[in-house]
Amino acid sequence: MLITFEGIDGAGKSTQIQKLAAYLKQEGREVLTLREPGGTEVAEKIRHILLESRHDITPVGELLLFSASRAELVSEVVRPALAEGKTVILDRFFDSTTAYQGYGRGLDLNMLRTLIAISTGALTPDITFYLDILPEEALIRKFSEKSLPLAFENEELDRMERSGLEFYRNVRQGYLDIIEAEPGRFKSINARHGVQEIHAIIVKTLNERFKEQS
């Protein structure tokens, strides 16, 4: 099973992925957790280029780098793991491309769909958990985590984190539009709930999905 987590930066994905992976391992499942961009030697190098704040990358260049990283991850790690019967949990997948590069950067959505199909080989998650939070609240969380003042020009932020509030508002709208188009694949969760409450919702939803597949 392929499980993906989506949401704007600061929504709490990493915490929930860790908790879900621990739960599934206790249930006897073999679990592999991965992140995008990253997950292979080549993809991790691409991640460094993408997030390094001193790099000035065009929207199309950014898109192609994300796509290259994804192609490596899917081919080298994700598909082999799924073939071995493992449960793969991905911190971001192609929905991030649509939301961030499509809605956030304003790139053509049809072009994105073509690149997504090429980079994933049409691989689609069995379920996607979307943690929804207002950009204003998410960014306060991110700045607080890094003990930084609320200023987007701060050099301690990575390149994506410095994109600004309006960018993240567009990204969130992108996610909402994606979910409206594919409601069956998504479970949208209010990220303002407590950590344990969100985890309980995820576990309940996933167990129901396991039953459907058995």
Curated annotation (Swiss-Prot):
Sites where the protein binds ATP: G7, I8, D9, G10, A11, G12, K13, S14
Matches recorded under CDD domains: TMPK
Record's catalysed reaction(s): dTMP + ATP = dTDP + ADP
EC number: 2.7.4.9
PANTHER family listed in its UniProt record: THYMIDYLATE KINASE, UMP-CMP KINASE 2, MITOCHONDRIAL
Role description: Phosphorylation of dTMP to form dTDP in both de novo and salvage pathways of dTTP synthesis.
Name of the protein this chain belongs to: Thymidylate kinase
Organism: Chlorobium luteolum (strain DSM 273 / BCRC 81028 / 2530)
Name of the gene this protein is made from: tmk
